[in-house]
Regions:
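N-terminal Rossmann NAD(P)H-binding glycine-rich loop of SDR-like oxidoreductase domains
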Residues: 3-23
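NAD(P)H-binding glycine-rich loop region in Rossmannoid oxidoreductase-like domains
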Residues: 35-91
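Conserved Rossmann-fold NAD(P)-dependent oxidoreductase catalytic core, especially the SDR/UDP-sugar
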Residues: 90-132
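Conserved beta-loop-beta element that borders a ligand/cofactor-binding pocket
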Residues: 110, 143-166
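Glycine/proline-rich active-site loop of Rossmann-fold NAD(P)-dependent oxidoreductases
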Residues: 139, 151-153, 163-179, 215-225
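Alpha-helical substrate-binding/gating segment
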Residues: 176, 180-191, 198-232
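Mid/C-terminal beta-alpha module of Rossmann-like enzyme folds, strongest
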Residues: 212-213, 218-266, 300-303
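C-terminal amphipathic/interface module of NAD(P)-dependent oxidoreductases
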Residues: 218, 269-304
């Protein structure tokens, strides 16, 4: 199988590329101007891509996107987050749609933020979208693949939860919500639940995230797929489990107003103080088996 990956240098993309190469697949990255790596040249900001080089792939995986939680959501930052996902996906979708030999599948990133703040409701792939910037982003992100869908390409929307990796993403930010990791509250024994601690945090181990993407490549599933473990936890339980793995106390709560002051209200609410009790219905029904089904195992794998 020949697979092109956009975002192959990221935390998830790099592990996915290695996993596919390890089983004998041909993996080619999509590379931006100035990259020293060989691959399919593209520049989403300029709307350009090497169309001929995309001919003949079996699948394309698009994980590209500017980091959502690194900076406050100013107007400029919001636009950068939006364009890096929507415009890159539109470029890929319309390019794949006109190829003489298009790929059979486009596996495209999304997020459980699609559902907004779900409260205690169990959210399957058929649950409606929520409100707010992150929900609007995910709705537009998934809609940006429409040209590929109309061309008969099988499209999968990866609605990922919190991917457990100490090297980046939401877990990396949790370890250092107020700055660099060396002043992380958890590493100094000052961590605790954030806000009320009752918000649901859907999570998935990095290993299972990558295995689920490979599963999406190998099977005929299409449409939205919740990439989350079957046992979501509240922020309070997540924090306690993290404290046990790090061997640090978790007795000092972090008030929601502190996060809103530091991060901005919209970012703090969307990424930390709100939650989704998402369920991996499509994965389970399609025969996927999780390696890490409980949060303790997932966190041990992340720090192992």
């Amino acid at each position: 199988m020949r697979v092109a990956i956009a975002g192959s240098s990221g935390v998830i993309g790099s592990v996915l590329a290695a996993a596919l190469a390890g089983r004998g697949e041909e993996v080619i990255p999509l590379v931006r101007p100035g990259s020293s790596s060989n691959g399919v040249a593209w520049d989403p900001s300029a709307g350009t891509i090497d169309t001929r080089a995309l001919e003949g792939f079996d699948a394309v995986v698009n994980l590209a996107g500017h980091s959502i939680g690194e900076r406050r959501w100013t107007a400029v930052e919001r636009q950068r987050i939006w364009d890096s996902r929507i415009e890159s996906t539109r470029l890929l979708a319309r390019t794949l749609a006109v190829l003489e030999h298009p790929p059979a599948a486009l596996i495209n990133a999304s997020a459980v933020g699609y559902y907004g703040d779900g409260g205690d409701s169990i959210l399957s792939e058929t649950s409606p979208s929520g409100s707010g910037f992150l929900a609007d982003l995910c709705v537009a992100w998934e809609a940006a693949t429409e040209r590929a869908v109309r061309a008969g390409i099988r499209v999968v929307h990866l609605r990922s939860g919190i991917v457990l990796s100490k090297d980046g993403g939401a877990l990396g930010r949790l370890l250092a919500p107020f700055g660099p990791r060396w002043i992380s509250p958890f590493r100094w024994g000052l961590g605790g639940p954030v806000g009320g601690g009752r918000q649901w945090w859907p999570w998935i181990s990095l290993d299972d995230e990558v295995r689920a993407i490979v599963h999406a490549l190998d099977t005929g599933i299409s449409g939205p797929v919740n990439l989350v473990a079957p046992a979501p936890v509240t922020n309070r339980d997540f924090t306690r489990a993290l404290g046990r793995v790090l061997r640090r106390p978790t007795i000092l709560p972090i008030p929601g107003f502190v996060l809103r002051l530091l991060l901005g209200s919209e970012l703090a609410d969307a990424l930390v103080l709100e939650g989704q009790r998402a369920a991996p219905v499509v994965l389970i029904e399609s025969g996927f088996e999780f390696e890490h089904s409980d949060i303790a195992a997932g966190l041990r794998a992340a720090f192992g």
